[in-house]
Amino acid sequence: PAIIVLIHDGERALLGRQAAWPAGRYSTIAGFVEPGESLEDAVVREVHEETGVVVDAVEYHSSQPWPFPSSLMLGFLAHAATTDIRLTDAELEEARWVTREQLAAGEIGVPFEHSISFRLIEEWYDADARRPLREEPNVNRWGSGRT
C-alpha cells in the first residue's frame, strides 16, 4: 500500500511538486509503506524523508484504489510539529506552505476533484466552515487550467 498525507500547521498546508509536473501544480505528500511498517509510521517517515518536516497527530481520513502500481492509497491528515522545509529526497522539486487564501485565489494548482489528494486538501481547506474548494470560481485545477 501507499500513504498520502495533508500536513498542516492549522493556518497553512504543506504541498509538494515533482519536477515532471507543470509549474504551479502541487499535491499532498505520498509514498510507499515499507514491509513491517505501520501506516502511521510510514506517514511520519515519508514526510520527514521528503520534506524534513516532523509530523504528529496522524489521523486516517480515507482510501482510494491506485492503479499504479496496482495499489491502495491510504489518506491521512497530520499536524506539523516542525515547519522548516528541507528537501532531503530527490522526489520533490519544491515543497511550500500554502494558505487557504492562496488556494481560493487560484495561485496554487491542485489535483483533480476525484483524487484522494484533492479530498485531503479540501478537508483542510473547509475545516473552518468556508465554502468547499470545488466551488471556488478561480481555483486552478490539476490538468484543467483556470476555471
What spans do the regions from the language model cover?
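Surface-exposed, flexible loop/turn segments at secondary-structure boundaries
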Residues: A13, W21, W66-F68, L103
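Nudix hydrolase/Nudix homology domain
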Residues: P22-Y26, T88-T147
